From Swiss-Prot:
Signal sequence bounds: none
Location(s) in or outside the cell: Nucleus; Chromosome
Protein name: Transcription elongation factor 1 homolog
Organism of provenance: Homo sapiens (Human)
Pfam families: Zn_ribbon_Elf1
Family in the record: Belongs to the ELOF1 family.
Chain's role: Factor involved in transcription-coupled nucleotide excision repair (TC-NER), a mechanism that rapidly removes RNA polymerase II-blocking lesions from the transcribed strand of active genes. Acts as a key adapter required to anchor TC-NER factors to RNA polymerase II: stably positions UVSSA and the DCX(ERCC8) complex (also named CSA complex) on arrested RNA polymerase II, leading to neddylation and activation of the DCX(ERCC8) complex and ubiquitination of RNA polymerase II.
Gene: ELOF1
Assembly information from the UniProt record: Associates with RNA polymerase II.
A cellular-component GO term for this protein: nucleus
Reported effect, residue 79 to A: Does not affect transcription-coupled nucleotide excision repair (TC-NER)
One MF annotation (Gene Ontology) recorded for this entry: protein-macromolecule adaptor activity
A biological process term (GO) from this entry: transcription elongation by RNA polymerase II
Swiss-Prot/TrEMBL keywords: Chromosome, DNA damage, DNA repair, Nucleus, Zinc
């Protein structure tokens, strides 16, 4: 008689090691990585500004917000203004 087969644990899943971007492409002048985001958690505001064309946008944030959320709000506001 043989031994019973042992069950193996599945290999552990790999965690996401990448980080989210903090520099973005400006929708006005189209320069890559020219927009920097500053998150002011004390005042609950996020400010994104372009270093080339000096365009600036400010939006309210929450404790869960990330720089990409501020950028997406800016893009949404630009699209809403165009319509």
């Amino acid at each position: 008689m043989g031994r019973r087969k042992s069950k193996r644990k599945p290999p552990p899943k790999k965690k996401m090691t990448g980080t989210l971007e903090t520099q973005f492409t400006c929708p006005f002048c189209n320069h890559e990585k020219s927009c920097d985001v500053k998150m002011d958690r004390a005042r609950n505001t996020g400010v994104i500004s372009c270093t080339v064309c000096l365009e600036e946008f400010q939006t309210p944030i929450t404790y869960l917000s990330e720089p990409v959320d501020v950028y997406s709000d800016w893009i949404d506001a630009c699209e809403a203004a165009n319509q």
